[in-house]
Amino acid sequence: MLSALARPAGAALRRSFSTSXQNNAKVAVLGASGGIGQPLSLLLKNSPLVSRLTLYDIAHTPGVAADLSHIETRATVKGYLGPEQLPDCLKGCDVVVIPAGVPRKPGMTRDDLFNTNATIVATLTAACAQHCPDAMICIISNPVNSTIPITAEVFKKHGVYNPNKIFGVTTLDIVRANAFVAELKGLDPARVSVPVIGGHAGKTIIPLISQCTPKVDFPQDQLSTLTGRIQEAGTEVVKAKAGAGSATLSMAYAGARFVFSLVDAMNGKEGVVECSFVKSQETDCPYFSTPLLLGKKGIEKNLGIGKISPFEEKMIAEAIPELKASIKKGEEFVKNMK
């Protein structure tokens, strides 16, 4: 069922660069001047699916917008600077993508970003709840395992919560899993599709290699190494950049892939499947990432975990306590906000 619905990785991204698909999606990027925000905005500007791109940040957005506006694609671009301009940036938006926040430095976990990024996400999502309550909200800001519960609680406070429209963007985990499996097996990565479930940090990232399309087999030691590499791939990039940032280019690609899939589904395209960290009843965790069938109104159907191996079952059991703690931390943050 799942593999039949899942299209090859990156198909939405490639299609968005072709001229056949036409649409009028109005997309906002909050945190558009940052390391992820700039390349993400470039990919969105390059897509015929997007008709209006509004960019928000606390610095440099007029420059980023001016630069992007010279590109010969149809999306109009406008930059907005500072909190007083945020409402105008959000009005009429169909999709809001939030990569805002501080990046990881060597030695930091995603959870170390909590104190700074929790406040940023709570502030930005409160503005979304007020000025574009019906938009699809895509959260990239880490720690996603906590920032999605924060977003949900903020929307509840404003009385506009719709769990089918709030997404934690975990797509980079899938993109990495596809790339690493393809590398090991000598396959074309565009033809590999590995569902990744759970959360978006360390051992909560659970690649379901047993469900990979095409089917692949690894000896247990190689499977354990591959799984560990997928889980710690973000740290691999942080270390390689030696203090100069975290994964920005691959994250921008993954964020764009998710947005294009979402817009495709909103346009009525059928069979669009992406994994995302969302409100869930698949486990006893209130939020969990699984493959989702996307539709015109967001999540059309949660496709669940499916058939998994004992190794994957064990990973889920080990991930759940950490996931629950991160979720609770996010929920408590909003409850304690003044």
Curated annotation (Swiss-Prot):
It holds the Pfam family Ldh_1_C. Gene3D superfamilies: Lactate dehydrogenase/glycoside hydrolase, family 4, C-terminal, NAD(P)-binding Rossmann-like Domain. Glycans are attached at S33. Keywords: Acetylation, Glycoprotein, Mitochondrion, NAD, Oxidoreductase, Phosphoprotein, Transit peptide, Tricarboxylic acid cycle. Homodimer. Substrate binds at R104, R110, N142, R176. This is Malate dehydrogenase, mitochondrial. The modification N6-malonyllysine is found at K239, K307, K329. It catalyses: (S)-malate + NAD(+) = oxaloacetate + NADH + H(+). GO terms for cellular component: cytoplasm; mitochondrial matrix; mitochondrion. Acetylation is enhanced after treatment either with trichostin A (TCA) or with nicotinamide (NAM) with the appearance of tri- and tetraacetylations. Glucose also increases acetylation. It is an enzyme of class 1 (oxidoreductase). Its main location: mitochondrion. Its EC number is 1.1.1.37. NAD(+) binds at G31, A32, S33, G34, G35, I36, G37, D57, N117, I140, S141, N142, M251. Enzyme activity is enhanced by acetylation. It is found in: Mitochondrion matrix. The modification N6-acetyllysine is found at K78, K91, K165, K185, K215, K239, K296, K301, K307, K314, K324, K328, K329, K335. GO terms for molecular function: L-malate dehydrogenase (NAD+) activity; protein homodimerization activity; protein-folding chaperone binding. The lineage of its organism: Eukaryota, Metazoa, Chordata, Craniata, Vertebrata. The modification N6-succinyllysine is found at K78, K91, K185, K203, K215, K239, K269, K296, K301, K307, K314, K324, K328, K335. GO terms for biological process: aerobic respiration; malate metabolic process; tricarboxylic acid cycle. Belongs to the LDH/MDH superfamily. MDH type 1 family. The active site is at H200. Residues 1-24 form a transit peptide. The modification Phosphoserine is found at S246, S326.
